[in-house]
Amino acid sequence: MRQNKASTAPWPAVLLVCLFGCLAAGAAPDDLADDASLAAAVCPVVYQLDQSPSSRGYHYSFFGNAFFINEQGYLLTVAHVLETFRDGGQPYVLVSRRNSPPRLLQAAIIAVDPEHDVAILRATPNPFEGKHKVAFLPLAHEPAIRGQAVIALSLHPPKLQNAHTFQAPQEDRSSGEVLSYESTQLEKSVPSADVFLLSHSVTRGQSGSPVLALDSRAVVGLVEGRWLRSSAVSIAKSSSLSPSIPGAAVPIRYAIALLQRQSISWHTPQSPPSSSPTR
């Protein structure tokens, strides 16, 4: 009888182990789905070169990235990505679709802050109301801090010099950490602004890409592609981890300030939209 009791006693524990194991296994697909949704929020900023499509879709020029911040189709990017359109021309964003090639949507320039190199776009028609594969990213309410783990997420065409819409963009994920803050001029004849340095370098086409905190998956900054280090000594002071020139990002607080001035709402991590009602 004692042997029978000994053999049956562990069953509740076994059931609990199985239950937790099943729950853990069931959580994995959700995590993967969340991870995939990050890329769905990012769009290449482009200029359409053709009036009608070819067998490969529309031919376009690629300038950088933008990302959605709410369900109304508003996006953030860095202002210098839009320099080509200062004297005219219509920017577009390349938006993913389910079971179809990406589609070009017009991107209206809503507001630009050249001093802090941030800008707001709005895609029309609103891709969140159609059959598009889109998502939005929350904006962090706390600034990035030194040593914080981050990831920069960007898209670029497979062929930069011969890009067409029927070719799905390639995804780049650059992981690293925040090194330090510096003050620099982001535009001629304007006051200095803050940027924070990244432990990884920035490559061509990453301008305007979101920099997300790994823990919250909220945007803490935008990749600043034209920033250059002025002193090799400063590199050594910033970190001994990376021998290459570090990348830089515009703090998200500058973009949030521009959104507030335009009364445009955004999302914070696991919260309803912030600020005033969306225009």
Q: What is each stretch, according to the model?
A:
Residues 2-13:
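Bacterial N-terminal signal peptides that target proteins for export
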Residues 30-35, 90, 129-130, 156-160, ...:
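C-terminal cap/linker of serine protease catalytic domains
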Residues 63, 70-116, 125, 236:
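Catalytic-histidine neighborhood of serine endopeptidases
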Residues 81, 132-194, 202-207, 224-234:
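Flexible, gly/ser-rich surface segments that form the specificity/activation loops bordering the active-site cleft
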